[in-house]
Amino acid sequence: MSYSTFKRSLEIEVISAEGLKVDRKPLKKKTYSVVRIDEKSWASKVDELGGSYPIWKDRFDMEMPINASVRFISIEVYYRTSGSGRDKNVGYAKIPVTDFMGGFAPQGHLNFLSYRLRDEYGDKCGIVNVSIMVKPDGNDHKSSLPSSSFAVAPVDYAACSWQATAAARNNQMWRPRTSSSMVSTAGYGGGRVVTGVPVWCAYQRPS
């Protein structure tokens, strides 16, 4: 039995976050994100502009066991502190492996997803936008894919907030320009979506 049978290669991009809050107040600090699988972790660059709507667009290649030991991928967001020298946690989200593996998500399929962030008390503190692709293994159709397979991979935007979706389609970075553009994030879909579930209908999509 091959090594690829036990593990799958993933390509995860932590794109951005929206409406970050600390103690229910909009965050103004510089932030970064951390992806965790099992005992391994990968950190993004720091968003130097700071604020509640950071953009990272950092992509990581990683391997994930496909046995029952890993059921979730964790995304954590931290902000830089000026005095203590220790970064503080804003919130985290857990992404079920079943959201991007098996079922109707074949290997090589690029999934754009948005997840609720919650702080240590379980309160909602923002949304994180990610893309996840399970790379085809050597026994599948990997050899037939062009070197730029990321660019031509099938794409599903169904669970991504519409602002990030529009930016991704045009290969652009998205950040709200005025306070009026932040109004729609206040309720995050009426609070009916919880950590670990994609934010399917949190935003009204443009007509």
From Swiss-Prot:
Tissue expression summary? Expressed in roots, leaves, stems and flowers.
Q: State the organism of origin.
A: Arabidopsis thaliana
Q: Does the keyword Lipid biosynthesis apply?
A: no
* Induction record: Down-regulated by high temperature. Up-regulated by salicylic acid, AgNO(3), chitin, cycloheximide, ozone, syringolin, salt stress and upon pathogen or nematode infection.
Taxonomic lineage: Eukaryota, Viridiplantae, Streptophyta, Embryophyta, Tracheophyta
Subcellular localization? Membrane
Which parts of the sequence belong to the C2 domain? 1-112
What keywords tag this UniProt record? Membrane, Plant defense
Membrane topology, as annotated, equals: Peripheral membrane protein
Q: Which PANTHER family match?
A: BON1-ASSOCIATED PROTEIN 2, INGRESSION PROTEIN FIC1
User: Which CDD domains does the entry link to?
Assistant: C2_SRC2_like
According to its UniProt entry, the function of this protein is described as:
Negative regulator of cell death and defense responses. Exhibits calcium-dependent phospholipid binding properties.
User: What quaternary structure, including any partners, is listed in this protein's UniProt entry?
Assistant: Interacts with BON1, BON2 and BON3.
For the biological process aspect of GO, one term held by this record is: defense response
Q: Name one Pfam family in it.
A: C2
Q: What else is known?
A: Overexpression of BAP2 can suppress defects in bap1 mutants.
* Predominant location category: membrane
A cellular component term, taken from the record's GO annotations: membrane
Q: What is this protein called?
A: BON1-associated protein 2
Knocked-out gene: effects: No visible phenotype, but accelerated hypersensitive response (HR). Bap1 and bap2 double mutant is seedling lethal.
